[in-house]
Amino acid sequence: NDRSSNKNRGSVLSIYMIVLYGSMALGMFFLNFNSPLNFEPFILVSLFMSISLIPILLTKRKAPTFKKITGMSLKELYDISPLGMVGSLLYGTTQSALFSLLAVYAASMNFSIFEISIVTFLLAISGAVAQWPIGMLSDSFDRRLVIIYSTFGAALFGLFAILAGGQMYLPGELATTKNWFYISVVLFSFCSLPMFAIIFAHTNDFIPKEKFVAAGAGLQFAFGLGAMGGPFLCSIFMDLVGNNGYFIFLIFFHCAIGFFAIHRMKVRKTKDNPDSQFTPLPQTITPLGIELSPITEHIDEPYSEKVQKMLKRKGVAFRKKETEIPENTENLKDK
């Protein structure tokens, strides 16, 4: 956040999510190296966590410095970005259920351990690949539109996954291979997993820089609240409806995010990008016009003597600092 602007924040956050989901995808295959009932996989996880600290400890780049860090209540965060708060809460519910119960769902569909690792790998790697293009789209268009299309796209491909899962167990030649189910999961993940980064970027579009930390904490808190209840609610729904209740649960919450985003687009119009400094100016412009242009900044440092002489020869007047003796500019006015 410290090194990004509203023009590229979606792309920057996408890189972070690519690393996250890419590493998760690789971790899925460790299920095949040893039984989860043994202690060795947990030692391996502890080892990787320790190794992950090394780049942080060795980096020379300083942590972001904010001139002033101010707090923000959850109510204030909701007032600034209702879609950010509600979207984080609902998405936390879906993502926790998605990753926690996917293996349970696949096992109930008689998938082997290797096939389960394939499904979870495809889910994570597809989400990693999707981060960059969808993040760039969110930087080019209204982020709420990207959220709407992504959520309803995920709901559609979730429905395809239900149909593909049912087709696998039809009798005779009517049955299909598991490849169609894999494709449905990949497309579902492609639409769903970039969601939180876009919600995060959308919220920061309306928040001053000194409140980024507080806003991020609030969004993570809302995400965590949803994540606590997601697996529990989804498992109850699967008991009531059956195995297909897994994707029905995900479809319902994705549609809820999409409909709420549509509602917010009707309530709040698109916010102009505060980082954009475009101002219509003529091709030839006077010095006064340059001062009026918002892309030029006032420089407090005095000009060097060489530059001052050059400007005076060209008849250009310049202001001196208030602490200096004001210069008589009558002759310059005559010029």
Question: What residue ranges belong to the model's regions?
Answer:
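Cytoplasmic helix-loop-helix junction between adjacent transmembrane helices
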Residues: 1-18
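C-terminal membrane-cytosol helix-exit motif in multi-pass small-molecule transporters
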Residues: 32, 46-65, 259-265
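Intrinsic disorder in cytosolic terminal tails and internal cytosolic loops
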Residues: 66-70, 264-335
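Helix-to-loop junctions at the C-terminal end of transmembrane segments
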Residues: 35, 130-142, 238-239
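C-terminal ends and interior cores of transmembrane alpha-helices
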Residues: 153-173
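A membrane-interface helix-boundary motif in multi-pass transporters
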Residues: 33-47, 236-254
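Intracellular juxtamembrane helix-capping segments at the cytosolic ends
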Residues: 1-4, 193-207
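Structural signature of the two symmetry-related core transmembrane helices
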Residues: 145-160, 251
